[in-house]
Amino acid sequence: MSTVPVTDATFDTEVRKSDVPVVVDFWAEWCGPCRQIGPALEELSKEYAGKVKIVKVNVDENPESPAMLGVRGIPALFLFKNGQVVSNKVGAAPKAALATWIASAL
């Protein structure tokens, strides 16, 4: 499974009502650090397939979801479990650090 694009319209269905924990990556095309972590998140989405869903929200095209969560900088990662935020992280990080962060929140 690869990362799933999510919009403001699909946020509740894909994230808050998900049966599995969800990592939400708030990003933008122009954001260098966002592009840096993209490949790592793609790999992690395959490694965690069936256990964790990783979704991407483009903040330029979908401003409501990041505003609702108070996102001020990107990349901003939020981990949802049972529809609630259990952890968040701002800024780029290597794949190993992202994997540790995801695992610690499960």
Swiss-Prot record:
Single Gene Ontology MF annotation: protein-disulfide reductase activity
Which Cys pairs are S-S linked?
31-34
Question: Does Transport appear among the keywords?
Answer: yes
Sorted keywords for this record are: Disulfide bond, Electron transport, Redox-active center, Transport
This protein's record includes keyword Mitochondrion: no
- GO terms, biological process: cell redox homeostasis
Q: What family is it from?
A: Belongs to the thioredoxin family.
Q: What protein is this chain from? A: Thioredoxin
Q: Which organism is it from?
A: Cereibacter sphaeroides
Which lineage?
A: Bacteria, Pseudomonadati, Pseudomonadota, Alphaproteobacteria, Rhodobacterales
